Amino acid sequence: RDFVAVLRFQGPRANGMPELHKLTPILGLQQDKGFKVALVTDGRMSGASGKVPAAIHLHPEALLGGPLSRIETGDLIRVDPAKGRVEVLNVDLTGRTPALGPVRTNLSSLGMNMFAPQRDIATDAESGASTLGELDVTK
């Protein structure tokens, strides 16, 4: 079945922006069966993951109340790579309550706990996902 996979809470502050390339083979299998699939996320994927159309690094990230935090199961989503657009059809997202992000007390891995302070101060993807403050990415 055709679908858009929405993977939120993968941005710099929520989850440290992990590499999501392992999704490509799974989504690619659906493409191989003739389905149209795409991925929309506030996370990141390597350039080697180009088989599946993907809108990545969306900001503000879901944890900060970005648009992905308001998308619900069943929403119709159009991904237009040529125009660089993601649209949620027939829905006013501003009227929805943002979904809650992961609860930090449930983090079980050493890495997630150890790097929590860095995630708390990270800038958004548009600003470089830096823990050193705002970076001028235009230079």
List PLM regions with ranges.
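Feature captures the catalytic cores and cofactor-binding loops of soluble hydro-lyases/lyases
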Residues: R1-K139
